[in-house]
Amino acid sequence: MSIRIIPQDELGSSEKRTADMIPPLLFPRLKNLYNRRAERLRELAENNPLDDYLRFAALIAHAQEVVLYDHPLEMDLTARIKEASAQGKPPLDIHVLPRDKHWQKLLMALIAELKPEMSGPALAVIENLEKASTQELEDMASALFASDFSSVSSDKAPFIWAALSLYWAQMANLIPGKARAEYGEQRQYCPVCGSMPVSSMVQIGTTQGLRYLHCNLCETEWHVVRVKCSNCEQSGKLHYWSLDDEQAAIKAESCDDCGTYLKILYQEKEPKVEAVADDLASLVLDARMEQEGYARSSINPFLFPGEGE
């Protein structure tokens, strides 16, 4: 079952009631999203072998929070949603949606915010990006969206993605439509933008016990039932792995049918878990899954594959 975005004026009353039962989509809640992520990254950096990199990621997340409010986006997506709905495509499809110059404006603002905090190689990277031409930046963005990671160095990718993510999250936050669940394929990709998840989370509160995948680009979350592979939708050969015990707040769900895994975070075990931060801070679990022969079915926005990986 995939999820398609339906314009508000095309939803019947029965569909509106159905959408209220189990929300198929949770559009990004941008207020304090990046500050919460930055705080969680700093907290997880304590006594973590990746402490320096987690603090580095926290700096980027904090800069995203500042730039988000300094550079708001105004855009009417009504026509785009109608067109995408008619085509059965995500409304903000990364493979077809033309990129506005706004995302490069966000990138330059991020660089300006981060410069005073950076030194050494990291400072050299953002200064290099600052000097890049408009076309060079567009080429890097296109390569990342095409998963051509060998064309973008892994030290530049997090900065490019941080700006693209801000842009797409701002657009997703403006979608004036509703969502309904309908049968289809490719539920492993975000129904709003078509990007990959970073991790999944079993939530508390109004969505208690429901699992949502978190988009690594537009920050949307979409519902996928538990005990089913989020990559191939099979359920017969799933295994759950953790570094601590059965009550761990972070587990990896592996599937022997497709040979992949995705992390699951449990808010009931640790209410402060955050989709990006906790995924990044648990790379030891990724190493274990690689040893077991499984491939990761997601990408963390702060950790892109390098050339040859």
Curated annotation (Swiss-Prot):
The GO annotation for biological process reads:
protein maturation
Q: What's the protein called, per UniProt? A: Protein FdhE
What is the phylogenetic placement of the source species in the record? Bacteria, Pseudomonadati, Pseudomonadota, Gammaproteobacteria, Enterobacterales
Q: Is the keyword Cytoplasm in the record?
A: yes
Q: What is its main location?
A: cytoplasm
Q: Which HAMAP family match?
A: FdeH (MF_00611)
Task: Give the protein's function.
Answer: Necessary for formate dehydrogenase activity.
Keyword Transcription carried by entry = no
The record's NCBIfam families line, in alphabetical order, gives: FdhE, PRK03564.1
Q: Where in the cell is it found?
A: Cytoplasm
Gene Ontology CC annotations of this record: cytosol
Please state the gene responsible for encoding this protein. Answer: fdhE
Species of origin reads Shigella boydii serotype 18 (strain CDC 3083-94 / BS512)
Q: What keywords tag this UniProt record?
A: Cytoplasm
Q: What would be an example GO MF term here? A: ferric iron binding
As for family, the record states:
Belongs to the FdhE family.
